[in-house]
């Protein structure tokens, strides 16, 4: 019997994933990665109940120190530099999957699984296993996992790849799991009161009032601290002008936020930093790729360009979905081929 280590959060997705794996004949080992201070949170208790019901091993691993040093540090530094960071992508790549694979090796488990809505399939074009987006772009989570290396992908199982969320809840109800109607988590997991309150609590004196300005430097009003705003934001600015305005630039060094018309957000090219490709860059350079510059984006077509060791993505058409610090992920025929952070 082959073993699989599965990350379990206490939600319905990972719980049903564990059930499906057991039904498929695997020896399942449930692992909860706890980044919180409390040792017995509601999520941990829910996971214990599910594992007891399924008759599988459950282990809780404390990752608080790594989580603070890597994810929270990245999150705070990102907003402090005027970016809009993506902490879940960094957490998945640098902590969660790394630890799950280490635990799998400890148990001599052949596979690692999670409750993500994505799949791993073999690409005939690129002759390797790659992440592939699932049928519903609304639930597809391949975007979040683009930084996982090909050697990890070969050992990954995503049991939910062919299911809808409704079907998963129906399975959970059918097998009498208490989490069948548990709400999905919203926002970042470590900021239960919202990311703005988390920033205020942790950055404190670094958040100071500054000026809203137009592109010519004229003062339009005051903001509460540039860290509390994001590119493209329109609501919650606390300023009344004769026409709708959007945040087009955040100047962290001067504590100024530039406001402008929606049309000023449209660009046709972005530069990448911290890029990571599952397919050799040279194989992608002349291909038309679908780029998703944020998780909620359905994507825009264009091509990768390299100029003096810098990598850019040139869109076929301008769009207003790009924010500094967000990750842009590239797809070819549904397969995830790479991505990077928008500079």
From Swiss-Prot:
GO terms for cellular component: cytoplasm. Keywords: ATP-binding, Cytoplasm, Disulfide bond, Nucleotide-binding, RNA-binding, Transferase, tRNA processing, tRNA-binding. Its EC number is 2.8.1.13. The active site is at 91 (nucleophile), 189 (cysteine persulfide intermediate). Residues 139-141 are annotated as: Interaction with tRNA. One of its GO terms (molecular function) is ATP binding. Transmembrane segments: none annotated. The record marks 116, 326 as: Interaction with tRNA. ATP binds at residues 7-14, 33, 115. It catalyses: S-sulfanyl-L-cysteinyl-[protein] + uridine(34) in tRNA + AH2 + ATP = 2-thiouridine(34) in tRNA + L-cysteinyl-[protein] + A + AMP + diphosphate + H(+). It holds the Pfam family tRNA_Me_trans_M. CDD domains: MnmA_TRMU-like (cd01998). Catalyzes the 2-thiolation of uridine at the wobble position (U34) of tRNA, leading to the formation of s(2)U34. NCBIfam families: PRK00143.1, trmU. This is tRNA-specific 2-thiouridylase MnmA 2. GO terms for biological process: tRNA wobble position uridine thiolation. It is found in: Cytoplasm. Its main location: cytoplasm. Disulfide bonds join 91-189. Belongs to the MnmA/TRMU family. InterPro entries: MnmA-like, MnmA-like_central, MnmA-like_central_sf, Rossmann-like_a/b/a_fold. It is an enzyme of class 2 (transferase). The keyword Cytoplasm applies. Signal peptide: none annotated.
